[in-house]
Amino acid sequence: MELRDLQIFQSVADQGSVSSAAKELNYVQSNVTARIKQLENELKTPLFYRHKRGMTLTAEGRKMLVYVNKILQDVDELKQVFLDSETPSGILKIGTVETVSTLPTILSSYYKSYPNVDLSLQAGLTEELIREVLDHQLDGAFISGPIKHPLIEQYDVSTEKLMLVTQNKAFHIEEFTTTPLLVFNQGCGYRSKLERWLKDEGLLPKRIMEFNILETILNSVALGLGITLVPQSAVHHLSKAGKVHCHAIPEKYGSISTVFIRRKDSYMTNSMRSFLKTIEEHHHINML
């Protein structure tokens, strides 16, 4: 078993097909297929189900992937320990929820100060970003928090007001039972706050409509499709233009914190250290 066998296995698992993995790794397909077969023979167990749509992990394959991800992460960190220069460089993979209002300022400042770092930004929901940080797929992420996890180191970044957004100027709480709720998929911090509020009020929403893009939600509210709950900064432009109206909600549910997270046991590269410094320059940031 060689290191490149593990890299091939990881790529096939991530891509879901031999052809996509071969393209990603710049290998010929027959080589990828042979390496996977050789790995299965060596471990005496099938690691993938083969089907028309590609390949998916077996139960043993999923178990294998946990170890492979850890091994390859350790190899990357070993390289970083010896190759990490005083000048920040390399790739920094950062995840973020859509509504971190000062993120463009942070990224712009960081790029100007450290142009040798390639920033890779990925948007997502809080729960999936946490999972990707834990799986070493991201170096860190801005999420709705705070959270409690023994492997997570988190930094308090900011707190924002949450506003109920409607098309009409007036709003009554009973409208939750007659008007669709427009929300992100499960795993969104704003949705969790809204659902907790409705549960405490004993209200059952008429319909929940799920979206993946913030602008789609807000534009749909402006057209009268439904109502939503988002940070005030995210809806300021539409509210100022008179296209939607914002309503305060009870204080218990009316704010949400943004935190930056990373794995506690991950090697602190100069690139990450500099990124945290940049955040600190734009926010009052404390490690929780």
Swiss-Prot record:
Pfam family, one: HTH_1
Keywords: DNA-binding, Transcription, Transcription regulation
Domain of life the protein comes from: Bacteria
Cystine bridges: none
InterPro entries listed in its UniProt record: LysR_subst-bd (IPR005119), Tscrpt_reg_HTH_LysR (IPR000847), WH-like_DNA-bd_sf (IPR036388), WH_DNA-bd_sf (IPR036390)
SUPFAM superfamilies linked to this entry: Periplasmic binding protein-like II, Winged helix' DNA-binding domain
CDD domains in the cross-refs: PBP2_YofA_SoxR_like (cd08442)
GO molecular function: DNA-binding transcription factor activity; transcription cis-regulatory region binding
Ranges annotated as DNA-binding: 18-37
Domain HTH lysR-type: 1-58
PANTHER family (alphabetical): HTH-TYPE TRANSCRIPTIONAL REGULATOR, HTH-TYPE TRANSCRIPTIONAL REGULATOR GLTR
Family according to the record: Belongs to the LysR transcriptional regulatory family.
Protein name (record): HTH-type transcriptional regulator CzcR
Organism annotation: Bacillus cereus (strain ZK / E33L)
Gene symbol of the encoding locus: czcR
